[in-house]
Curated annotation (Swiss-Prot):
Keywords: Carbohydrate metabolism, Hydrolase, Manganese. Belongs to the FBPase class 3 family. It catalyses: beta-D-fructose 1,6-bisphosphate + H2O = beta-D-fructose 6-phosphate + phosphate. Residues 288-307 are annotated as: Disordered. Its EC number is 3.1.3.11. Its cofactor is Mn(2+). Pathway: Carbohydrate biosynthesis; gluconeogenesis. Gene3D superfamilies: 3.60.21.10. This is Fructose-1,6-bisphosphatase class 3. It comes from Staphylococcus aureus (strain MRSA252). Residues 298-307 have a biased composition (Basic and acidic residues). GO terms for molecular function: fructose 1,6-bisphosphate 1-phosphatase activity. The gene is fbp. GO terms for biological process: gluconeogenesis. InterPro entries: FBPtase_class3, Metallo-depent_PP-like.
């Protein structure tokens, strides 16, 4: 094969580029456009984390832009509208379809309604004009309702200086109303406002877990205009299950059974659980208290006795399968250092005791009827058949394929973005703050390099779904539960102990030292440097651990260098945190941390217009307003400009 020199490659590239920019005027126009964009203020970044399947609460935070929508409305209208009018306009932007129906019921005749239409369209146009003031016209156009772009642009850029077009603008709006298009236009404008107040969304992990509707969250994210995802431990568990890890699949199903969320698997993703139920009905009892499903906070009606009985049996069946499946993985991967988790081999089945970490405990609520004492890892033929069927169903689910592919496409283990490091869990360190090493395939890795290797194997496992026992697939499970995992962040997962040992001391899961060292500003600066970021300007933005504000914990740590934004969307954690978690806004003026109150119901917002927000705390204020030039996007644009200028000099100026 002929070797192409760098010079020849550059010439071929410029030749291709010149086909698109075939005149100096076209090329100059593009350079001028890109250079000008660099001088615009950076767009607003919105950081959310730990959604845990709580679709309703997440939807609300997305619709209100963590309070950004109301702030913009107040900026323009606070001295012009009454409190009720402000509240109504806010609710209309958040939930346009629902609020429109309520408002229309208040009017007695079409004349009153038409006046309201004219006023509301004018208010929304003003709001869009304000929210889009730092965008180019082409970017704004992409955010407008597609079918009404012409009308909206005419109203946005109206200039009646010489009084020649007054009748024209009035006719535009009147015809919209007369032709019954006002509702759709208002709905479209409301969604344009939502889109304009947030330029880019960062989801810092855990879309999945115990909440009831992660699939709806995924559908919402797929349709969102601009985002990235940093995988959480629960996200990787789902990826692992889809990629062929039966032990990940068993874990996932056990969690769904424990939190009465099997309908995610059955109804949302169309997975048939009947074979698992048949197995469970054959071997397990319905009255094991350790395996009764937890009450779901979002479910008002109680489970029937039959439903509870079936879930309790399924819960036991899949837990036993999980503990069996863990054994061969641990044994074939001695570098995982997980021998203490060979729990079924450590049980004394005669005395009903277990010895773990050098201590012997009596066992309660046991369900070992399918365990072979001489070979605890051995699955019954029925268990093996059930897991094969379930794995095939998972991999054949079109909806799950779409969601997992999107997670892989938009996701990563960590992301350096605009000078900050976004990471869900932790950077594994020892007590001295040194990066912990982990051996993979005969080579030792730590820090950023370790995370890069983990991510490589997640992607490899996903691409080779037919391989279920290879190193890559086992490493996806290790990310869920291993002591050097950046996602788990603890020394061991004590699932077995929580089910079967009464002594709660055995349930304790020791956290990686990262979680107390992240309070230290020098430690955080060192981590930022290790990831190639400027420690003077950068921050680590972290999810995964609920901030217990109720106990005085502060989400702003290490002199503002570490921000913990576990969204607290999971209702199960809200009693221990005291709030419904944090989100973060980062615009050209600086960063604001937003503390959310518990989201009760959108009905309250629709009727009263009072938002469940949210206390904003300024993390910092930029001394100089940040421009697109100072962002990752700015670097990309600058690289494009450099190439275009090279073409200009090569073809037209020299």
């Amino acid at each position: 094969m002929t070797q192409i020199t760098e010079r020849e490659l550059k010439k071929k590239y410029l030749d291709l580029l010149s086909q698109h920019f075939d005149t100096p005027e076209k090329l100059a126009t593009e350079i001028i456009n890109l250079e000008s964009i660099l001088e615009l203020p950076k767009g607003t970044e919105h950081f959310v984390s730990d959604l845990h399947g709580e679709y309703e609460a997440f939807q609300h935070v997305l619709r209100n832009g963590s309070g950004n929508v109301r702030a913009k409305i107040n900026d323009i209208f606070k001295d012009k509208l009454s409190t009720k009018e402000l509240n109504d306009l806010t609710a209309l932007v958040y939930y346009p379809e629902d609020k429109l129906q309520l408002i229309k019921c208040d009017f007695q005749n079409y004349g009153q309604l038409n006046v309201w239409y004219i006023t509301t369209i004018e208010h929304l146009i003003q709001l869009i004009k304000y929210c889009s003031s730092k965008y180019t016209r082409s970017k704004l156009r992409r955010a407008l309702p597609e079918q009404y772009v012409f009308i909206v642009e005419e109203l946005l850029y109206k200039n009646n200086e010489f009084k020649n077009k007054k009748s024209y603008y009035e006719t535009l709006v009147n015809q919209v109303i007369e032709l019954k298009q006002a509702d759709d236009l208002i709905i479209g404008l409301a969604y344009s406002v939502q889109r304009l107040v947030v330029d880019h969304l960062h989801v810092v992990g855990d879309i999945y877990d115990r909440g009831p509707q992660p699939d709806k969250i995924m559908d919402t994210l797929i349709n969102y205009h601009s985002l990235d995802i940093q995988w959480g431990n629960h996200d990787v568990l789902w990826v692992g299950a889809y990629a062929g890890s039966k032990v990940c699949l068993a874990n996932l199903l056990r969690i769904c059974a424990r939190y009465d969320n099997l309908d995610i698997v059955e109804d949302a993703y169309g997975i048939n659980l009947r074979p698992l139920l048949t197995l469970a009905e054959k071997y397990y009892d319905a009255d094991n208290p350790a395996f009764k499903p937890k009450k779901r906070p979002d479910k008002h009606e109680r489970l029937t006795q039959r439903e509870e009985s079936q879930i309790t049996k399924i819960h036991q069946a899949i837990a036993m399968i999980q503990f069996k499946l863990e054994i061969p993985v641990i044994k074939r991967r001695p570098n995982f250092e997980m021998d203490e988790r060979l729990v079924l081999e450590k049980v004394n089945y005669d005395t009903n005791e277990i010895t773990v970490y050098g201590k012997t405990y009596p066992l309660k609520d046991t369900c070992f009827q399918t365990v072979n004492r001489d070979n605890p890892a051995k699955l019954l033929p029925e268990e093996e058949e059930v897991m094969n069927k379930l794995l095939l169903s998972f991999q054949q689910s079109e909806k799950l394929r779409r969601h997992m592919s999107f997670l892989m496409r938009k996701g990563s283990l960590y992301l350096p973005c605009n000078g900050n490091l976004l990471i869900h869990g932790c950077i594994p360190v020892d007590e001295n703050g040194e990066m912990e090493s982990f051996e993979i395939d005969g080579q030792t890795y730590s820090g950023q390099e370790l995370l890069d290797v983990f991510e490589y194997h997640v992607r490899k496992s996903f691409d080779e779904k037919e391989n279920t026992d290879d190193l890559s697939t086992d490493l996806v499970w290790y990310l869920w539960t291993g002591k050097y995992s950046s996602l788990f962040g603890k020394r061991a997962m004590t699932t077995f102990e929580r089910y079967f040992i009464a002594d709660k001391a055995s349930h304790k899961e020791e956290k990686n030292p990262y979680y107390h060292l992240r309070e230290d500003v020098n430690m955080v600066r060192k981590m930022l440097s290790d990831f190639g970021l400027n420690p003077d300007e950068g921050r680590i933005i972290n999810g995964h651990t609920p901030v217990k504000e109720i106990n005085g914990e502060d989400p702003i740590k290490a002199d503002g260098k570490m921000l913990v934004i576990d969204g607290g969307f999971s209702k199960a954690y809200q009693s221990t945190t005291g709030i419904a978690g944090y989100t973060l806004l980062y615009n050209s003026f600086g960063m604001q941390l937003v503390a959310h109150q518990q989201f009760n119901a959108k009905e309250k917002i629709l009727s009263e217009g009072i938002d469940e927000l949210s206390i904003k705390r300024i993390v910092d204020k930029e001394l100089q307003r940040k421009k697109i030039r100072n962002t990752n996007k700015g670097k990309e644009l600058q690289a494009q400009i450099d190439i275009l200028k090279m073409l200009m000099h090569d073809r037209y100026l020299d």
